[in-house]
Design a protein with these regions (language model features):
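Short, well-ordered surface patches within globular domains
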Residues: 109, 162-228, 264, 270
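Disulfide-stabilized, aromatic/cysteine-rich ligand-recognition loop
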Residues: 79-89, 93-94, 248-250, 279-332
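Acidic glycine-/aspartate-rich tracts in secreted/extracellular proteins
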Residues: 39-42, 51-55, 114-116, 143, ...
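Bacterial N-terminal signal peptides
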Residues: 1-10, 14
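A short glycine-rich, aromatic-capped structural motif
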Residues: 95-157, 170-173, 258-259, 325
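Short, composition-biased motifs enriched in small/polar/acidic residues
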Residues: 14-98
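Short, well-ordered junction/capping motifs at the entry into regular secondary structure
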Residues: 231-258, 279, 306-310
Length: 332
């Protein structure tokens, strides 16, 4: 972060949802760290942002959420607006997020691959710093045929129905509809943080989770000789999709983040800042992670599979979900 960092401590032992903080407009590069302490031992805390303290609910945007039982405090970097005051408030829910969802804190990472990484593609560079400014949850598994069929009423997969195989041949549009229905279902069950939703991960969120704090070609290191311990690919998959969770997860607990089926990402495929893209149509979506039929180079953390239209149906294509703020709603 550029500029001075000042900590604003937010003590919330009782009046959860009542505390609020105001940041006045500023032209400086100052960054404040909003620190929340003394939270209950269970449940989920959500931090909201608005330009009007008296605004109604729909004018407050959820910018960060975290399981309060995991931390005694949570620091969130925030920047004042150049034009309007920024108000922050806290809410808390006594809920348990589904156990298959892993919470990831805000953080910075290097996205993309360096010029010297073997078998890299031109759209993977240049390496650039990315800030994930919100906590979010990501599914430790790819969505299975069982989960997809139960919610959607059909199974587009190329295989016979098998409960623990990842669903494949899913279009981006269908994956989005799955997320919409899952949001409605878990909202009704009161297991979803307020202001958050199920959706596809952005490319940045996906690579952040895949890398798990590493800068190597794969989440476990650089050696292709170890890939078969971590992902299903051309040399160990017998040419077929494998059950989820059968190999070693990455350091943050995500299974099949390398290989098995490709995973749709939410945002539109574009060149990185200062980089080159294979398509500039502005309508294409992107797969990540590689698949069971792919060579090792496609399973690298930085690899961006060829862009496709949202209605594209591919035998290698699946997805996993995140619980996160609506795309574009976080602070950046």
């Amino acid at each position: 972060m550029i500029g001075l960092c000042t900590t604003l401590v937010w003590l919330c032992p009782e009046a959860l949802g009542q505390a609020s903080i105001q940041l006045s407009p500023s032209d400086s590069n100052n960054t404040f760290s909003l620190s929340v302490t003394e939270l209950p031992a269970t449940g989920v805390a959500v931090i909201w942002r608005s330009t009007n303290l008296l605004a109604k609910g729909e004018h407050w945007s959820a910018v960060h959420a975290f399981p309060s039982g995991k931390q005694t405090k949570s620091d969130l970097p925030v920047r004042p607006s150049k034009t309007d005051s920024a108000f922050f408030k806290l809410s808390w829910q006594n809920i348990i997020v589904p156990e298959n969802m892993i919470w990831l804190p805000p953080g910075d990472f290097k996205m993309g691959s360096p010029d010297g990484e073997p078998k890299r593609y031109k759209d993977e560079g240049p390496v650039h710093s990315v800030t994930i400014d919100h906590g979010f949850w990501m599914d430790r598994y790819e969505v299975t045929q069982e989960r997809f069929t139960a919610l959607m009423g059909n199974n587009p997969s190329s295989t016979e129905y098998t409960t623990d195989l990842p669903v494949n041949r899913v279009t981006w549009d269908e994956a989005r509809e799955f997320c919409k229905r899952l949001t409605e279902l878990d909202s009704a069950r009161n297991t979803l943080p307020l202001g958050y939703q199920y959706r596809l991960p952005t490319e940045a969120e996906w690579e952040y989770a895949c890398r798990a704090g590493t800068n190597s070609a794969y989440s476990y290191g650089d050696k292709t000789s170890q890939l078969s311990q971590h992902g299903w690919w051309a040399e160990n998959s017998r040419g077929q999709i494998e059950q989820v969770g059968g190999l070693t997860p990455n350091p943050w607990g995500f299974y099949d983040i390398h290989g098995n089926v490709f995973e749709w990402c939410l945002d539109t495929y574009r060149a990185y800042p200062g980089g080159t893209a294979y398509s500039d149509s502005g309508t294409m979506k992107i797969f990540r992670g590689g698949a069971y039929y792919c060579p090792s180079s496609i399973l690298r953390s930085a690899c961006r599979a060829e862009p496709q239209k949202p209605d594209y149906r591919w035998v290698l294509g699946g997805f996993r979900v995140v619980i996160a703020p609506p795309h574009g709603q976080a602070q950046n």
